Amino acid sequence: MKFRFGEGAEGTLNTSVTTAMIDQEKRAADLKRRKNQMLLFGGATLATLASCRLTARGISSRRYIPKMFQANHMPPQSDMVKEAAMAVVFATTMALSSFSMVVFGVAWSQDVTSLKQFALKMKTKLGAQQIEDEIRNAPMTPETQDLQDQLAGALKKD
């Protein structure tokens, strides 16, 4: 197949044109992934704002404000089990939405797409990879070698 624009010596597409097309596809995929991460972070932020607003409304509606000539040292009777359950619900929704906002925000800002990639980035940033390599390459003590040989022998007998 011959092309007029971008022809090489044999009449095929020039490699720079195909490389540019591949780069453009990578950029489009990267843009789509970043947009998805942004939308996840935005959704988690909206969930956090909604849960905070509901919690504030729930707290303010339960406040006891006595009217004139009412005793302010004896609030009206209420169902303590219901109050405790609502407190747990409010705290849980706020904690989960805040945690999800932090997770999606870090993933978006650090360009993390999977848990495996997150683990690798954290290992490199915290220096755990060097420590693992040192431990892996450390010489084995005679006691450890003897124990390893005994365990290997016991497992071979079975």
Curated annotation (Swiss-Prot):
Name of this chain's protein: Altered inheritance of mitochondria protein 11
Coiled coil: none
Keywords carried by this UniProt record: Membrane, Transmembrane, Transmembrane helix
Cross-referenced PANTHER family: ALTERED INHERITANCE OF MITOCHONDRIA PROTEIN 11
Region (Disordered) location: 136-158
Its membrane topology: Multi-pass membrane protein
One GO CC term, this protein: membrane
